[in-house]
């Protein structure tokens, strides 16, 4: 099959969240199954210095009344064909943000559709998150191109319909409130990035006001778990580590722990219980829970904590405050650094993911691969990947809690700290975690089956009256409504 991946991110060049890892790692796993898989992303300014890009494009056209060009290069790791949509709107190095974000990604979706129609024509166009959400709408009546839409994070839903109608061509048959909604309605298959998240988003608690719509399309909704690249993330061969190690010879972790403690300004104590967190510093990731329990944990246990990431300024400031209160025991590094992230996975004893919601999560898979035991909330993909430790049966791979409450998180942390003090049992726990196999090969087979189901098949148009039942609607420009109210008050 010919498959084109369209996304706003692609690791390692363009990565903010887990979507970048998926778009980088899933295509080569599919290519190993014999498929012709290619990728298309916006031609962000920084890519021209990172990749070998020919000066002449392979395709020129117009989208939304503006000229664009498509350049062909190769992905630096997989060597798969990588297409870049060149346009001045993508010249800045930023990926997200800015007043033009809605226009930029709607334009990217439009340019991708033009490219798929008139240049390299895929059988399956695999779209990722709202940035590509209009593509399934435009492809809905093309019998030669089927669409798959992957939900990485339902919280981010893109521009409302009234704004889409101002920016671009919206077909007469289009239903739905915003870009995320129309993508789910018109894609031939929709999938979430874990089985549990696929179920959760059909409930009011996690559905982000789209649970009614998701139940309406549940017949074409799937849950496919993400994986990790086992070659890239391999503690036996990882060149970023001071000492390599494996499940059968775990001694190298001691050297990595000492190196991490030294580099982060922590007291170099081999027996301290070292906890790590890597990721976006936002409420979704449960950083506020960590802030509420950290002082008590540090007061009553011999723990140390290291945090790596960037995010909301209030959370960053609160983490800095903890670092100043507990020098040598709490460290924070406000950036993303691949080398440091690998050292945290390889040097910490446990890894923290107390998420409010978690579509899949990659970090817990990497932590287990490197022998750092996850302490997670039972939500989303964390349910599918981390099983609770049972010391009496010597089963499980981590420590889990249910409610998003400080006391529940703290209790899980104390249980993990107590387990850490029983070193032989802890080593067996580490070995169980390290021998889990969440490779992309398994996920690729599931995606391949979904592609086979959908290839050459077009879903019927959604019923307008049924869709209207699920509208939460901002169906007109709010500024126009204000203007009408003002006129009536005169």
UniProtKB/Swiss-Prot annotation:
Which InterPro entries would you find in this protein's record? Glyco_trans_1 (IPR001296), GS/SS (IPR011835), Starch_synth_cat_dom (IPR013534)
Q: Does the keyword Transferase apply?
A: yes
**Residues noted as binding ADP-alpha-D-glucose in the record, renumbered to the chain:** 15
**Does the keyword Transferase belong to this entry?**
yes
Top-rank lineage group of the source organism: Bacteria
Note the coiled coil stretches, chain numbering.
none
What keywords sit in the KW lines?
Answer: Glycogen biosynthesis, Glycosyltransferase, Transferase
Protein name, entry field: Glycogen synthase
